[in-house]
Amino acid sequence: MELPANVQNQLMQFQQLQQQLQMIMYQKQQFETQLKEMEKAIEEMEKSGSDEVFKMAGGILIKRNKAEVKEELSEKVETLQVRVTTFEKQEEKMQKRYTELQESLQKVMGQGQ
């Protein structure tokens, strides 16, 4: 049975949306992982009694002022939080569109039988 052109188009949109949604979820997960790592680094630095910490730079460790490194990490945390929030909003919109398209396709496919 040949599917009508509009249904084929919807199926193609559905598959593309599914791929985009998976990519958004993957990217969001990557940023969430980085965010947790940064937060853990800040937490560990706060436990340290020293005013200096070592920071990895290009494969070597460099002694740095703890307050400066903490400020850098805090800025990175803020940036990552914004990115995660952005990806969450995108994911939510795409998930809604995905569900709508899925329901529409189920309806059309159900009528064709």
UniProtKB/Swiss-Prot annotation:
Keyword vocabulary terms for this entry: Chaperone, Cytoplasm
Source domain of life: Archaea
GO cellular component, one term: prefoldin complex
Compartmental location: Cytoplasm
Protein name: Prefoldin subunit beta
Organism of origin: Methanococcus maripaludis (strain C5 / ATCC BAA-1333)
Single GO molecular function: unfolded protein binding
Protein family according to the UniProt entry: Belongs to the prefoldin subunit beta family.
Record's keyword annotation contains Hydrolase: no
Known role: Molecular chaperone capable of stabilizing a range of proteins. Seems to fulfill an ATP-independent, HSP70-like function in archaeal de novo protein folding.
Chief site of localization: cytoplasm
A Pfam cross-reference name: Prefoldin_2
GO annotation, biological process: protein folding
InterPro entries attached to this UniProt entry: PFD_beta-like (IPR002777), PfdB (IPR012713), Prefoldin (IPR009053)
Subunit structure: Heterohexamer of two alpha and four beta subunits.
